[in-house]
Amino acid sequence: MNISNKYGLRNSPPVRTSDGLADEAHPEMGMASKLLCLFPSSLVNYLIALAAIFSINFILPRLMPGDPLQAIYGQEALVVMSDEMEAQLIRQLSLDKSWWDQMLAYILSLMQGDLGFSYYYREQVSQVILGALPWTLLLTGLALVLATAIGLILGIESGYARGSSLDRGLVAGLMFLGGFPDFFIGILLLLIFAVSLQVLPISGATSPYAGHEGLAHIADILKHLALPLASMILVQLGGIFLLTRNTIVTLLEESFILTARAKGCPERCIKYAHAGRNCLLPLTTATGLRIPQLLTGALFIEIVFSYPGVGSLLNTAIDARDYPLIQGILLVITLTVLTANFLVDLLYSRLDPRVRYAH
């Protein structure tokens, strides 16, 4: 019998809080609050970091001793600066104006996507970088996804079979590989598979003058990508594997794992659905920390394999002392790292509701 009916009380309507009334009266406010929840509270920190990056990128070239034009194109430069080029550089960089005017012109140029002019390639810096950036993003993106997936699976299997020969072999082997830099592993793979066995191409991203189209072109790209990608995966695999394995070893002693076993859940379900899913939070945090390392490793790997990415472009710009191009590359790399870390923060707040509710 209902207690309220027993004492002659009517069922009271559900209580509506002030937040609920506000959402009903102003549905756009509720939608706005939901949209704000999509962004982490550290957005202000990213904006401050972005402003600091722009400031450093503006100030550093102007702190060079002597004439900035001679600092950029002196006697050691591979490109001789003509009078027309000097006048264009002074006008473009606003070197005949005050620092505040130069800063304003710099910010306006960035807002318009103008990163300067490359005097080695005789082209806009943004166009030069856009030609190389997709190759670097392809290499680092695939390395990040594949290394994370393989490391997650191997870590779960190894942690679940702790103390076995499989566990000991994986720990020893992946720790050994993780101790080498990316470019060293790349040189070894290059000597074995490209020079000795001659089963994979030695350099480049595509076969020149091959005329491949469709699936043949994709297969050619993947064939050239195999060695650089394998070099980065082998080095990154150790850290992901150890983090996942240690997390699994800790989780197997938790009460919810014992409860799942007591309910009769299959071991495969416990391994991946219960223990494996809880590895995603620390793995997501580690991913944000590994992105700068991945990009740095990709720069050296591209030089080893003559891969036409941002790393090879930066090497050429340094040799030619093309400072506008160097500035543009460093700015794009830094913005890529900031954007990737921001997306990781967003993903973390989606995976762990406690982070959302804490703010």
Regions found by a protein language model. Give the residues of each.
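An internal, D/E-rich "acidic patch" concept
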Residues: 27-35, 95-152
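Hydrophobic alpha-helical transmembrane segments of membrane transport/permease proteins
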Residues: 50-100, 197-218
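Short hydrophobic, aromatic-rich alpha-helical segments embedded in or entering the lipid bilayer
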Residues: 80-112, 305-317
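Alpha-helical transmembrane segments of integral membrane proteins
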Residues: 33-36, 129-166, 209-359
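Transmembrane alpha-helical segments of polytopic membrane transport and secretion proteins
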Residues: 1-46, 162-163, 346-359
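Membrane-water interface segments at transmembrane-helix boundaries in multipass membrane proteins
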Residues: 172-238
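Helix-terminus/capping and membrane-interface signal
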Residues: 28, 49-57, 135, 139, ...
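Hydrophobic residues within alpha-helical transmembrane segments
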Residues: 40, 44, 142-146, 173-176, ...
